[in-house]
């Protein structure tokens, strides 16, 4: 992992600012002489910059995103807790962690930081910009903000705006965090129980009825407690608490809520999408209840050069992370055209 420190004030879309920022990022492979082999991966909500680890089925030597052929970049987003400036970072003005005083950031603010890193790395054009879920939000915004620097787009399980359904889910998750009285305490562990509950809510939308019944149904019909499904959800909550922070989760859920490519651009999402002329591969997942295929179908109707593939998966929204074999096949076929 590498770190880029930008020592100047950065204005945020909501009117606040940060006195300086640090961006944690990872790179794989080598940039070629004419810098034409750059692939930039935008990550989702609780991921980090180590894309070759959490998307190992797609990225690596000999994989469809080949580290022997491409120069791959992934940057941790503003507001996260994996090295980039966020609630746990030290405010250079107060010399103490931001904690709950960290300002709201939008997807556009995250992309603004990505652009600063792009400039720092000397990248003039991105051959392929890709992301799933919240990563897709960043990719679309970036393509609008720097259209002439993006070659192709690969978007998975994502949408042009955050849906009312998504906002409602995020609100429920924030209510869970806010119910934990420790969540705004001056501590990295603040809100841990609330974060666990928020993750539990999220898991119900990342998966679905079919996969939960198939994987977590109890064979013992005489049980009165300690059900397999309950243990699974508890485990997922505990696992996230070990690696993430309630303040970042609360903040980034707000970032997702504000995702709307039409904001400040006239509001006509369909019209704005028509300006994204890049060759685009869209992946939708037939069992996704968080960002259903209707969202990708909308993108497909209004992006001039899009191709939509709907994959069969039992894993719902998480399919964009799990189904790397079939996704790799579709991406390889598309890139070869």
Residue ranges and their predicted role:
Residues 125-164:
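Conserved hydrolase catalytic core segment
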Residues 276, 282-284:
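Short beta-strand/loop motif that positions the catalytic acidic residue
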Residues 26-92:
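N-terminal cap/lid subdomain of alpha/beta-hydrolase-fold enzymes
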Residues 297-298, 305-337:
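Catalytic active-site module of serine/aspartate enzymes centered on a nucleophile-bearing elbow/loop
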Residues 149-151, 155-239:
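Alpha/beta-hydrolase-fold enzymes
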Residues 289-295:
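Conserved alpha/beta-hydrolase "acid-adjacent" motif
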Residues 63-116, 167, 171-182:
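Cap/lid segment of the alpha/beta-hydrolase catalytic domain
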Residues 1-38:
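Catalytic-loop region of hydrolases
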């Amino acid at each position: 992992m590498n770190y880029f420190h930008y020592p100047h004030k950065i204005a945020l879309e909501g009117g606040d600012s940060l006195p300086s920022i640090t961006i944690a990022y990872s790179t794989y492979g080598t940039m070629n002489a004419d810098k034409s082999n750059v692939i930039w991966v935008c990550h989702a909500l609780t991921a980090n910059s180590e894309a070759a680890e959490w998307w190992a089925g797609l990225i690596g030597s000999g994989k469809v995103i080949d580290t022997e052929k491409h120069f791959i970049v992934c940057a941790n987003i503003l507001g996260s807790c994996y090295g980039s400036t966020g609630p746990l970072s030290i405010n250079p003005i107060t010399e103490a962690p931001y904690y709950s005083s960290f300002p709201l950031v939008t997807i556009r603010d995250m992309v603004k930081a990505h652009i600063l890193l792009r400039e720092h790395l000397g990248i003039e054009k991105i051959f392929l910009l890709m992301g799933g879920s919240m990563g897709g939000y960043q990719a679309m915004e970036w393509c609008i903000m720097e259209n002439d620097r993006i070659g192709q787009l690969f978007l998975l399980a994502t949408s042009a705006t955050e849906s009312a359904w998504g906002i409602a889910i995020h609100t429920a998750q924030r209510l869970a965090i806010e119910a934990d009285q420790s969540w705004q305490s001056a501590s990295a562990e603040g809100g841990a129980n609330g974060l666990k509950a928020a993750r539990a809510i999220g898991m119900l939308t990342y998966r679905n009825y079919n996969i939960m019944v198939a994987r977590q149904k109890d064979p013992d019909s005489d049980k009165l407690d300690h059900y397999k499904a309950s243990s699974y959800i508890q485990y997922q909550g505990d696992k996230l608490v070990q690696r993430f922070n309630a303040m970042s989760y609360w903040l980034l859920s707000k970032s997702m809520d504000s995702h709307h490519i039409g904001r400040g651009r006239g509001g006509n999402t369909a019209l704005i999408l028509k300006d994204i002329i890049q060759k685009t591969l869209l992946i939708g997942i037939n069992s996704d209840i968080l960002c259903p295929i209707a969202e990708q179908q909308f993108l497909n109707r209004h992006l001039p050069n899009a191709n939509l593939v709907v994959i069969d998966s039992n894993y719902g929204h998480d399919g964009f992370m799990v189904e790397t074999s079939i996704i790799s096949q579709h991406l390889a076929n598309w890139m070869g055209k």
